[in-house]
Amino acid sequence: ATVMMASAEKLPANVVGVLADCGYTSTREIIKKVMRDIKLPANLLYPFVRLGARIFGGFDPDASSPIESMKKCKLPVIFYHGDADDFVPCDMSRENYEACASEHKRLVITEGAGHGLCFPRDRHGYYIALDEFFRPVLSSQTSDLSQNQ
């Protein structure tokens, strides 16, 4: 989620793409999802969690939203998510993918992978997808650099 939010910011020229692995859509939604998972009334308690974050943490969970950043992202983005992720729902990556404004994007769902485990679950497939996705991007960056010398 952090790299998705950073992708909407002004970044150095050497940042040529984003690998978003099992990112959530918003801090608010992931907090509420976890609350529901532990059988707490999320809609009732979330305002208190938000207040606590503002008072004790110095931040507003409603202010951080990867999906909103995706609407401004122009960098190439490859989204990975495991279909067995029981922490961040796979649908959140689908929503982030749909919201992404980049013309060069791809969503890879890894069968049987839990949260953050796409790479260990399918190393070969992960490498292949990364190579296929970023090779054209990196090739154009290399040719741009050689033309400027």
How would you describe each model-predicted region?
Residues 135-149:
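Alpha/beta-hydrolase-fold serine-hydrolase catalytic core, especially in secreted/extracellular enzymes
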Residues 66, 75, 89-98:
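Short alpha-helix in the alpha/beta-hydrolase fold that links the catalytic acid
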Residues 72-74, 79-81, 85:
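Short beta-strand/loop motif that positions the catalytic acidic residue
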Residues 84-88, 116-117:
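Acidic catalytic loop of the alpha/beta-hydrolase fold
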Residues 5-60, 68:
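Hydrolase active-site cap/lid region
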Residues 113-127:
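Catalytic histidine-centered segment of alpha/beta-hydrolase-like enzymes
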Residues 98-117:
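Catalytic histidine neighborhood in serine/cysteine hydrolases
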